[in-house]
Swiss-Prot record:
It comes from the Bacteria. The keyword tRNA-binding does not apply. The active site is at C330, H434. NCBIfam families: cobQ, PRK00784.1. Transmembrane segments: none annotated. This is Cobyric acid synthase. Residues 249-442 form the GATase cobBQ-type domain. InterPro entries: Class_I_gatase-like (IPR029062), CobQ/CobB/MinD/ParA_Nub-bd_dom (IPR002586), CobQ_GATase1 (IPR033949), CobQ_N (IPR047045), CobQ_synth (IPR004459), GATase_3 (IPR011698), P-loop_NTPase (IPR027417).
Length: 495
């Protein structure tokens, strides 16, 4: 197996474009026939993905694996932090949750985490021809440098070259790049191979004097300037993506709870031309919706109380009274039930609380998570059964207390199992499946059930593929990658 130099992409800030840049590089290398894997030593996100072997990684790394045309693997994101309070997060190591830690606890744990990070990187290096690595936040955060495993601490330990990307759309790009480099140690500066400027709009000739100044002051080349790509429909890692090209007439409202998880579930709705998807924040109302969906949550009991504090439970009651439909996904499904019990204190203090009481289910949180990729059939009332795909990430086990309709049949190696509940009035539907809207047939079935006439789904896989290819083409045109991989790419004018 031929080997190519690994490369680490670090950023001057969060949301500088590291995730997209790594995805684009993975696709460019894959298009050249190179077996490439993405890698992020440490990620913090509430959006996670499930691997085939039942592990949990950041959704960004699953997206990057798709860009590389390989299957997601737990070693692509060995340390995942999922915040469940303002000061604490569940720590997931090589796909498995170990415990919840506060900031100081994890700071001390990083010394123990580095061997897992290096083990995962070694696995990828041995099994792929090239590894493209994503940093986290900025490498110049002085307070986080001790025992760092996410940025230069990893780069030094693994001896990998680095490029630094900055978002010019935010302003201050030269201060960001020059200042970030200046705050690094001499050995760290030496492994920086160059800079990339992201999201540029306008005439690049006006930028050239600044680029020349930066190269002269730092002695580092600018590898290129990537233009701002409008309408790039990729999953957002952290912030909820609410941009819509067109707003349809069918209004879907999603209450934004404090620990909302896997909000990428709603991307097929956001991109659909007949749907007006609205994320409803603090102080706003759910009134006026055609369809209300309660999202997943990392802290179900706390977010249930938040829903009540905002008066959204009253909005839901009124919505149902006038014939509206309501759906709950994962944590949202649990909230719609009779009770939520947490005897082990998984989410904090052991307790048992009342749910919204719309579905005859009772949920108990357990230490062992359910982490599964799912395929099966969805049979909503008065509709033909259709194909459904998705994934489960939850610690709760829900027991059906009545004889309400269970709409989803899941195919497993051993036997059939079942998921979800629909109430007798056919107005409320709950499921544990994240990604339930991604399969076109399931999308059409659920939205038809919810009241959208003549519903026709969009193909999320095709939309993602188009976006990844756009990124790759833009980077191929904009960057001089011969400075990193001279045996793969021809020399290109950087600017």
């Amino acid at each position: 197996m031929r080997k190519y130099s690994p490369l680490m992409v670090q950023g001057t800030t969060s949301d500088a474009g590291k995730t997209v840049l790594v995805a684009g590089l993975c696709r460019l290398l894959a298009n050249k026939g190179i077996q490439v894997a993405p890698f992020k030593p440490q990620n913090m996100a509430l959006n996670s993905a499930v691997t085939e072997d039942g592990g949990e990684i950041g959704r960004a790394q699953a997206l990057q694996a798709d860009a590389a045309r390989v299957k997601p693997h737990v070693h692509m994101n060995p340390i995942l932090l999922k915040p469940n309070t303002d000061i604490g997060a569940q720590v997931i190591v090589q796909g498995k949750a170990i415990e919840t830690m506060d900031a100081w606890g994890f700071h001390d744990y990083k010394k123990l985490a580095m061997p897992y990070v290096l083990e995962s990187f070694s696995y990828l290096s041995n099994n792929y021809e090239c590894v493209v690595i994503e940093g986290a936040g900025s490498p110049a955060e002085i307070n986080l440098r001790e025992n760092d495993i996410a940025n230069m601490g990893f780069a030094e330990a693994a001896d990998v070259p680095v490029i630094i990307v900055a978002d010019i759309d935010r302003g201050g790009v030269f201060a960001h790049l020059y200042g970030t480099l200046a705050l690094l140690s001499e050995s760290e500066q030496a492994r920086v191979k160059g800079f990339v400027i992201n999201r540029f709009r306008g005439d690049i000739s006006l930028l050239v004097p600044g680029l020349e100044w930066l190269e002269e002051k730092t002695g580092k080349p600018v590898l290129g300037v990537i233009p701002y790509l409008h309408g790039l429909n990729l999953e957002a890692e952290d912030a909820i993506k609410s941009e819509q090209l067109d707003k349809g007439k069918f209004i879907v409202k999603v209450p934004v709870v404090t620990r909302i998880s896997n909000h990428t579930d709603f991307d097929p709705l956001r991109l659909h031309p007949e749907i007006d998807l609205q994320f409803i924040g603090k102080g706003d109302s759910l009134s006026g919706a055609d369809f209300i969906i309660l999202p997943g949550s990392k802290s179900v009991q706390a977010d249930l109380e938040y829903i009540k504090s905002q008066g959204w439970d009253k909005d839901i009651e009124r919505h149902l009274r006038y014939g509206g439909k309501v759906m709950g996904i994962c944590g949202g499904y649990q909230m719609l039930g009779e009770h939520l019990a947490d005897p082990l204190g998984i989410e904090g203090v052991p307790c048992r609380v009342k749910g919204l009481g719309y579905l005859s289910i009772s949920t108990e949180l357990q230490k062992q998570k359910q982490l599964t990729l799912v395929e099966g059939t969805l049979a909503l009332p008065n509709q033909n059964a259709v194909k459904v795909k998705g994934y489960e990430i939850h610690a709760g086990v829900s027991t059906n207390l009545g004889k309400e309709h269970i709409p989803i049949s899941i195919h497993t190696k051993d036997a059939m199992r079942y998921d979800g509940t629909i109430n007798d009035e056919n107005s409320i539907f709950g499921t544990y499946l994240h990604g339930v809207f991604d399969e076109p047939e399931a999308f059409e079935a659920i939205l038809t059930w919810a009241g959208l006439e003549k519903c026709q789904a969009i193909n999320m896989h095709d939309i993602q593929e188009e976006a990844i290819e756009r990124i790759a083409k833009s980077m191929e045109d904009s960057l001089d990658l011969s400075l990193i991989w001279p045996d793969v790419f021809e020399k290109n004018k950087a600017y």
